[in-house]
């Protein structure tokens, strides 16, 4: 059963997907895109979770967490030039019971629109550098 449109999901934004000013479209391009559900694990707890299981220092460090509402994601997909019906499917993992996937293939153009709609969360208790604003 797909994740409800009222839920919010997050995705780790690591240095390989961040150009210093914005997230790269490759963050969402492709199929079976991994996300995590805030209804299962709160945002504050995702920082440690992503640092332990997504980060791969020194070349891949967690910079930010991007958040989007599932309904907003679906609206972006339906409104895209080549309409795409996006769903978020729960796929719990041992390391992340909040893990889910967007199974549909997302084009670079659609991924660009999704990335622009993300709410970007900086690490807790850290001041953003001017280049990150």
Model segments located where?
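Betabetaalpha-Me/HNH-type nuclease active-site subdomain
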Residues: 9-13, 17
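Conserved NAD+-utilizing ADP-ribose enzyme module
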Residues: 1-5, 17-18, 23-133
């Amino acid at each position: 059963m797909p994740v409800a449109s009222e839920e919010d999901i997050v995705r780790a934004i690591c240095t390989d997907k961040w150009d210093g000013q914005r997230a790269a479209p490759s963050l969402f391009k492709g199929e079976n895109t991994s996300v995590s559900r805030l209804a299962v694990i709160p945002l504050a707890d995702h920082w440690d979770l992503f640092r332990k299981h997504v980060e791969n220092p020194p070349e891949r460090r967690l910079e930010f967490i991007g958040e989007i509402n599932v309904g907003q994601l679906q609206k972006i997909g339906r409104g895209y030039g080549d309409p795409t019906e996006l769903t978020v499917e729960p796929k719990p993992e041992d390391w992340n019971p909040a893990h889910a996937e967007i199974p549909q293939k997302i084009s670079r153009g659609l991924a660009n629109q999704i990335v622009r709609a993300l709410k970007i969360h900086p690490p807790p208790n850290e001041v953003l550098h001017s280049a990150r604003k």
